[in-house]
Amino acid sequence: MANQKIRIRLKAYEHRVLDESADKIVESAKRTGAQVSGPIPLPTERTLYTVIRSPHKFKKSREQFEMRTHKRLIDIIDPTPKTVDALMKLDLPSGVDIEIKL
């Protein structure tokens, strides 16, 4: 797999779980002899929801909820077949969304 790059984007609502997953990926890639760039923190997405507190009236009384999506980017440069196998066998938490591009 010469001159190839694997780009991994991680998304999660909790940044601690996200950082632990990124560390696991970087550690397993370095252990198999690949060069790793990252984890690079990407901008956090902040979604704000405003709802009326009461079911019928009092429109001035509102409540706001926010949802933050934390993101990280990891580039694995010149991966070996061992690197790909190690990444496939890696067990990561279910709260982390993983997007892999070759």
UniProtKB/Swiss-Prot annotation:
Keywords: Ribonucleoprotein, Ribosomal protein. Pfam families: Ribosomal_S10. Disulfide bonds: none annotated. One of its GO terms (cellular component) is ribosome. InterPro entries: Ribosomal_uS10, Ribosomal_uS10_CS, Ribosomal_uS10_dom, Ribosomal_uS10_dom_sf. The keyword Ribonucleoprotein applies. GO terms for biological process: translation. Gene3D superfamilies: Ribosomal protein S10 domain (3.30.70.600). GO terms for molecular function: structural constituent of ribosome; tRNA binding. Belongs to the universal ribosomal protein uS10 family. Involved in the binding of tRNA to the ribosomes. Part of the 30S ribosomal subunit. This is Small ribosomal subunit protein uS10. The gene is rpsJ.
